[in-house]
Amino acid sequence: MPKASEVKKNTAIEFNNNVYLIRDIERSVPQGRSGGSLYRMRMYDVATGSKLDHTFKADEMINLADLSRHEVSFSYIDGDEYVFMDIADYTPYHFNKDSIADEILFINEETQGLQVLTVDGTPVAIELPANVELVIVETDPSIKGASASARTKPAILSTGLSVQVPEYIANGEKIKINTAEHKFMSRADSK
């Protein structure tokens, strides 16, 4: 059993006789109090989808649930459901559009390194790779010779995600995006 300070995002835990998936963790250090840090965790019940915010002390022990990961690829959209296919055994995993709204902004047919997290065989979340490559569909014209400048401009990508990019980037270019920070990393390697 890990301590609360050792638990990471997208971990499944058992809490109050239910299984929750941790979606966000905020660390705080109370002023004027002896003791350690506090970890406020935003969790979602795997069975019902209901949200729970709970604060744990850093040294509080947490029970982990049986969580497994399956490498998948995005397959197709069926109404409000997004369907992902297991790369190893072709098992389809269905997700409601609302339950993966944040992840959808980084996913297209070419996205590699996606994983479905399952608890007791039930899909509960999509885990994104550290970075993805997406195409810019709308941005201001590029400025020649602006590579030495640190100024940025907004760009809309093929999935609808909006990020800040350097001024020398143009429409139609494929770029790498950091999925955790929602930030431009570099131009994608041309193959």
UniProtKB/Swiss-Prot annotation:
- Which SUPFAM superfamilies does this UniProt record tie to the protein? Nucleic acid-binding proteins, Translation proteins SH3-like domain
**Domain of life of the native organism:** Bacteria
Q: Which segments does the entry list as coiled coil?
A: none
Q: Which GO terms describe its molecular function?
A: translation elongation factor activity
Which Pfam families does this chain map to? EFP, EFP_N, Elong-fact-P_C
The cross-references to PANTHER family, in alphabetical order and at most eight, read: ELONGATION FACTOR P, TRANSLATION ELONGATION FACTOR KOW-LIKE DOMAIN-CONTAINING PROTEIN
* Family membership: Belongs to the elongation factor P family.
**Record-given protein name:** Elongation factor P-like protein
Species lineage: Bacteria, Pseudomonadati, Pseudomonadota, Gammaproteobacteria, Alteromonadales
